[in-house]
Curated annotation (Swiss-Prot):
GO terms for biological process: fucose metabolic process; polar nucleus fusion; pollen tube development. GO terms for molecular function: glycosyltransferase activity. Pathway: Glycan metabolism. InterPro entries: FucosylTrfase_pln, GDP-Fuc_O-FucTrfase. Belongs to the glycosyltransferase GT106 family. CDD domains: O-FucT_plant. This is Protein EMBRYO SAC DEVELOPMENT ARREST 30. It comes from the Eukaryota. The keyword Transmembrane applies. Residues 401-412 have a biased composition (Basic and acidic residues). The gene is EDA30. Glycans are attached at N119, N444, N522, N534, N544. Pfam families: O-FucT (PF10250). It is an enzyme of class 2 (transferase).
Length: 656
């Protein structure tokens, strides 16, 4: 009897102990779940605060300017005799621009240059993505949705006469389509405008241009027209100022990124459906995304934009450098360079095809990955958009339920007996399955026309790209996911790289060769997360060399012939000290690939000396990246590997 009572007490004790253990585990799970459910913005600032004073400064050289480019200074002023425009000119040019932010920016620069070439007055272009018919706020017109009109007109007063609208006497004739209309390609030459367009302009006094290729004038102008190239620079880098509201919010975003005094890196993935379809990169994605890319590629083949087969080997295209680097690959490259897991990375781009799923590996490697939605509140973004008229929601309506009478009639009209049992009732259809850019794939063979809400969202993308552009230009480091794609269209990353090269040539901008990078990835693709030391050093050598002379030469050879704004050297820069002749490199046609800049005026030299003194006083000197990495001992490398292993999130397995 006593023995049985002891067993009961032991069983009761075990039961209480089990219940207590279960309660403790549940409470721990709940508290950890609450801790994990934080916003990216709160985590960012908490991370900053915890890192103050504890940040490892061994890798400060990864953020430092490139010393070999510090002699370059922005200088787009006219060099020779440059007469001011006259009101007695050859007439007016009005234009309609189609496309996104990058195409708009490049096209406006070409239009101003053409107006100067033809001695004509330019009417402020109409941006078709931001017309009021697209549902934007009545507070803005098309051009003023993005840019400051008054600044644009005032800055160009010594280059081109710019008017907000056509004179009243000509508006009616334009509505009746009485004026010649041209649809130039982005490779149109000055000869085309002087011989074909100018005579009609003089005759009709007004011509119209429809620009849809991201430009209407060839990038490489004759050597006799350097002033027109400098005019392009003055338009892109001075006259085209974002409207004040965008500038203020962009500056606030940069201040928030640098709140703790730490630098940040901007990364633009370049995952845009149009570019992916053009280059045949569908197989790099899965399921619905691959189908959407192939559908767009079929459309481009039908429209004769592409003269290739529909189905191509995407992996072969990737190995040739024709597809963007995936975010996972970029994360591995940044790790190989030595960037800490705590590095702050700003994700630019209004369109990231593939959604958040393709960003998961990068976010796991760098938790401080933020974008405009995590830096700005909903109210701040709404104020930027302005007051808009409410649009009807695109709600999916369930088909009406059939009555008993209808069901009975269908049963009677069915085939001969014995009849099979009716199918079970359909599962409920949820609204999110029929909404969005992918909803049509399950029901239709053709993509439906954009709804009013889709058109409005496309206009909003211009604002998001403008914010990202301003932040990327100000970043301490810029890493492009897809530039120099060879399509002939301007791209976001190339425009950012060009503006950074003009404003701050020594800022760290990686100009990598994707073909070389993919060759390196093919060596270690089976074990990308644990590369050997030789692979890491080869990656570092290539990426660090792309920051300086070799990267600029490659950019000049590949990017400049298609987009002058992506590489405005040597026309729009000067050097505070002359470059040795032995270091200047020219192409076969005599064009400078590296060097060839004029010597800076004294006022630029003196300003540059003062700035360099300030910079030297603020920051200590660091050895060159490549030399520092070559001198790294085996022991230091092992320590860095151990440190990165401790930085790794314990719950994240790279092989999952």
């Amino acid at each position: 009897m006593v023995f049985k009572s002891r067993i009961k007490w032991i069983a009761l004790f075990v039961l209480i102990l089990s219940m207590g253990s279960l309660v403790v585990h549940l409470s721990m799970t709940k508290s950890s779940g609450v801790q994990l459910a934080y916003s990216a913005r709160d985590n960012l600032w908490q991370d900053f605060d915890s890192l103050l004073g504890a940040q490892d400064f061994r890798n400060k050289h990864l953020w430092r300017p490139v010393k070999s480019l510090e002699t370059l200074q922005p200088y787009a002023n006219p060099r020779n005799s440059y007469p001011a425009p006259s009101s007695k000119n050859n007439g007016f040019i009005y234009a309609k621009i189609f496309g996104g932010f990058d195409k708009i920016r490049s096209s406006i620069c070409d239009l101003v240059t053409i107006s100067r070439l033809l001695n004509a007055t330019l009417v402020i272009p109409e941006l078709q993505e931001s017309l009021r018919s697209k549902g934007i706020s009545n507070k803005f017109k098309s051009f003023s949705y993005l840019y400051d009109e008054e600044q644009f007109i005032a800055f160009l007063k010594n280059d081109v006469i710019v008017m907000k609208t056509l004179p009243e006497s000509l508006k009616a004739a334009r509505k009746r389509n009485e004026f010649p209309l041209f649809k130039p390609k982005n490779s149109a030459s000055p000869k085309f405008y002087l011989e074909d367009v100018l005579p009609k302009l003089k005759k009709a006094n007004v011509i119209g241009l429809i620009v849809s290729d991201g430009g209407c004038l060839q990038s490489a102008l004759p050597a006799s027209m350097p002033e027109l190239q400098r005019l392009r620079c003055r338009v892109a880098f001075h006259a085209l100022q974002l409207r004040p509201e965008i500038q203020v919010l962009a500056k606030e975003m940069v201040d928030r990124l640098r709140k703790s005094g730490q630098p940040f890196l901007a990364y633009h993935p370049g995952l845009v459906r149009e570019k992916l379809a053009y280059h045949g990169c569908a197989e790099l994605f899965q399921d619905i995304h691959s189908e959407l890319i192939q559908y767009r590629r079929a459309q481009m083949i039908k429209q004769r934009f592409i003269l290739e087969e529909l189905i191509v080997d995407s992996r072969l295209r990737r190995d040739n450098g024709l597809c963007p680097l995936m975010p996972e690959e970029v994360g591995i490259l940044l790790k190989a360079l030595g960037y800490s897991q705590k590095a702050i990375i700003y994700l630019a781009g209004s369109e990231i095809f593939g959604g958040q799923r393709v960003l998961i590996p990068l976010r796991a490697m760098f938790p401080n990955l933020v974008d405009r939605t995590s830096l700005c509140s909903t109210e701040e973004l709404s104020e930027l958009v302005g007051p808009e008229t409410p649009l009807p929601e695109n709600t999916y309506k369930m088909p009406p339920r059939k009555s008993d009478k209808q069901l009975k009639e269908e049963w009677n009209k069915a085939g001969p007996r014995p009849r099979p049992l009716p199918p079970p009732p359909d599962r409920p259809i949820y609204q999110h399955e029929k909404e969005g850019w992918y909803g049509w794939l399950t029901e239709n063979d053709t993509e439906p026309s954009p709804s009013p809400m889709d058109l409005r969202n496309q206009a909003h993308r211009l604002l998001w790209d403008a914010l990202d552009f301003a932040v990327s230009v100000e970043a301490d480091v810029f890493f492009p996911g897809f530039n120099n794609d060879g399509s002939g269209w301007p791209d976001f990353s190339s425009l950012v790289m060009g503006q950074r090269l003009y404003e701050r040539p020594s800022s760290r901008t990686y100009r990598l060769d994707r073909k070389v990078i993919q060759e390196l990835f093919n060596i270690t693709r089976e074990d990308m997360y644990h590369p050997n030391r030789n692979w890491t050093l080869r990656v570092r050598k290539h990426l660090n060399s792309s920051l300086g002379e070799s990267g600029l030469i490659r950019q000049s050879m590949l990017s400049k012939p298609r987009s002058f704004l992506s590489h405005p050297l040597p026309e729009c820069s000067c050097r505070t000290s002359a470059l040795e002749d032995s270091r200047q490199i020219q192409s076969d046609d005599g064009r400078f690939l590296y060097g060839g800049e004029d010597e800076c005026p004294k006022w630029i030299k003196s300003a540059g000396v003062e700035k360099s003194k300030t910079d030297d006083g603020d920051q200590p000197d660091y050895d060159h990246d490549l030399l520092a990495e070559q001198s790294e001992t085996e022991e230091e490398f092992a320590k860095s590997k151990v440190a990165s292993a401790f930085d790794q999130d314990e719950e994240w397995d790279p092989n999952d």
